[in-house]
């Protein structure tokens, strides 16, 4: 049986194996899917070992998306633009194709939630692989984007990298202190450690919506912080996770599974 896995650090919390189990059951396409904790400095070695053992497809989560981008022999257009890869597929010629399904996963979920409209002003918090993976579809959708990051130079670099696609305003965290945004997206990994980004509470208001690309059974730290400061419409990244996984599954198998029933099952399991 073909082997697939998610690579990350940490990875114990990952719902990806459960999602792909549900996709396999739904489509009748069986595949073995596991999760692999990869030492921070051993991504290349872990990937080579997995491929030698019969692996043909990998999902990549933090902090390895940029390394997967470098490792891929071929890239889809959305992966090339983002500079980050969350899905690898071993081709028949033994070359690795790198894709990024994060953006389509996020956009699909934002549309499902009715969180996004054309012309909206969006603040993206974070400038790593997760943030870069979602910028292309948001720009294509017609959104106005501001990006901020703890290391401001990275926000500037990301804005410059996407200048051919659309205008992104880089802003220092310390100067963001007014409620000018329609949608605020946390694309940092701060929630994994129970932390929040170092942002001003004054960016929130009762009219903006918040989305955390991190997910957990309870409210994420970022969403709890936003709620405390007046936000009443919010969501975590579980829907995005299922959406990006569906498009990874399509890359590997040529079939796009239904997202809604899998998302419903996961929500029920998390609540219980």
UniProtKB/Swiss-Prot annotation:
Name of the molecule in the record: Shikimate dehydrogenase (NADP(+))
Keywords, in A-Z order: Amino-acid biosynthesis, Aromatic amino acid biosynthesis, NADP, Oxidoreductase
CDD domains for the chain: NAD_bind_Shikimate_DH (cd01065)
Bilayer-crossing regions: none
Gene Ontology annotations for the cellular component aspect, listed alphabetically: cytosol
Pathway involvement of the protein, from the record: Metabolic intermediate biosynthesis; chorismate biosynthesis; chorismate from D-erythrose 4-phosphate and phosphoenolpyruvate: step 4/7
Single Gene Ontology MF annotation: shikimate 3-dehydrogenase (NADP+) activity
Family named by the database record: Belongs to the shikimate dehydrogenase family.
Positions bound to NADP(+): 77, 126-130, 149-154, 213, 237
Subunit and partners: Homodimer.
Source organism of this protein record: Photorhabdus laumondii subsp. laumondii (strain DSM 15139 / CIP 105565 / TT01)
InterPro entries listed in its UniProt record: Aminoacid_DH-like_N_sf (IPR046346), NAD(P)-bd_dom_sf (IPR036291), SDH_C (IPR041121), Shikimate_DH (IPR011342), Shikimate_DH-bd_N (IPR013708), Shikimate_DH_fam (IPR022893), Shikm_DH/Glu-tRNA_Rdtase (IPR006151)
Reactions mediated catalytically: shikimate + NADP(+) = 3-dehydroshikimate + NADPH + H(+)
Function: Involved in the biosynthesis of the chorismate, which leads to the biosynthesis of aromatic amino acids. Catalyzes the reversible NADPH linked reduction of 3-dehydroshikimate (DHSA) to yield shikimate (SA).
Gene3D superfamilies assigned to the protein according to its UniProt record, in alphabetical order: Leucine Dehydrogenase, chain A, domain 1 (3.40.50.10860), NAD(P)-binding Rossmann-like Domain (3.40.50.720)
Active site: 65
Enzyme class name: oxidoreductase
EC code: 1.1.1.25
Record-listed shikimate binding positions: 14-16, 61, 86, 102, 215
One of the Pfam families matching this protein, by short name: Shikimate_dh_N
UniProt record, GO biological process: amino acid biosynthetic process; aromatic amino acid family biosynthetic process; chorismate biosynthetic process; shikimate metabolic process
């Amino acid at each position: 049986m073909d082997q697939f896995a998610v690579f990350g650090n940490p990875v114990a919390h990952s719902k990806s194996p459960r999602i792909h189990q549900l996709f396999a059951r739904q489509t009748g396409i069986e595949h073995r899917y596991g999760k692999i904790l990869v030492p921070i400095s051993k991504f290349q070695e872990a990937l080579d070992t997995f491929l030698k053992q019969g692996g043909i497809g990998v999902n990549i989560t933090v902090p390895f998306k940029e390394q997967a981008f470098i490792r891929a022999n071929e890239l889809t257009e959305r992966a090339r633009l983002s500079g980050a890869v969350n899905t690898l597929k071993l081709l028949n010629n033994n070359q690795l194709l790198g894709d990024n399904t994060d953006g389509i996963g996020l956009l699909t979920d934002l549309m499902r939630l009715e969180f996004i409209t054309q012309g909206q002003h969006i603040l993206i918090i974070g400038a790593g692989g997760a943030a870069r993976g979602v910028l292309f579809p948001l720009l294509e959708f017609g959104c106005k984007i501001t990006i901020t990051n703890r290391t401001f130079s990275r926000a500037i670099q990301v804005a410059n990298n996407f200048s051919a696609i659309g205008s992104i305003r880089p802003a220092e965290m310390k100067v963001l202190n007014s409620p000018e945004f329609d949608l605020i997206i946390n694309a940092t990994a701060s929630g994994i450690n129970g932390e929040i980004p170092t942002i001003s509470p004054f960016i929130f208001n009762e009219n903006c919506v918040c989305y955390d690309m991190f997910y957990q059974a309870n409210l994420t730290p970022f969403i709890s912080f936003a709620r405390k400061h007046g936000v009443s419409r919010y969501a975590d990244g579980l829907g995005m996770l299922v959406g990006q996984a569906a498009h990874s599954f399509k890359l590997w198998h040529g079939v796009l599974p239904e997202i809604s029933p899998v998302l419903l099952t996961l929500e029920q399991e998390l609540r219980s």
